[in-house]
Amino acid sequence: MKTKFVAVILGMALLGASSVACAQFGGLGSKLSGVTGGSSSNVSPEGIVTKYVGGAQNVNKADVKMLRAVGLKEEADRAELQAKNLTEGATQGSLEDATKVQTDSSKALQEKFASGKVEMDEKSKKQFADGMVDLAHGLLAYVGMSKEASGFKPAPTAIGSSSLSAAYVVKTLPDSIKSLGSTLKSSIDFAKTNNIPVPKEAADATSAI
């Protein structure tokens, strides 16, 4: 009888130890799963769109200031209107419009730089320099979120507006960074040629490209 009692006690002890071990390894499995899954498990489509819009707003502000500074008022007005229309809950269509305006603004600026026909007073030079700071901030925002965005993989069943917008951001972000980087470098060259002090933020941002 005593032997049976001891056997029961030992069996219960082993069962308890087994349960603890399973719980511990189960927790470890969850942790490993989180690691191997990367940051994508913590990335929401809404978060990606919100961060992208924040960067895009800086780029739009930069475009408005720099375009006006070099006398491109019509293009500046277009960029300003786009800035007002772009919100945190932007749809894919809104983001496509924003990308087009940014591309058109960059093209207009670079063509103006190349023309050599730019007259600027001290006020416009300061406005141009301020725009370079905004452009640097926008570019760094894009670069900063690029790694996070690259880890985003929408679920196969995700058909919501935010998921479509986030997928668009992931697809176009590398080209946007490349385009803005080129515009910033051209702006720095233009500033140096026209005796416009180059802001530290602009110079530093080029190293992040």
Task: Report residues per predicted region.
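N-terminal signal peptide c-region/cleavage motif recognized by signal peptidases
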Residues: 16-20
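Extended amphipathic alpha-helical interaction segments
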Residues: 97-209
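Immediate post-signal-peptide N-terminus of mature secreted/exported proteins
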Residues: 24-92, 96, 205-209
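Bacterial N-terminal signal peptides that target proteins for export
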Residues: 1-9
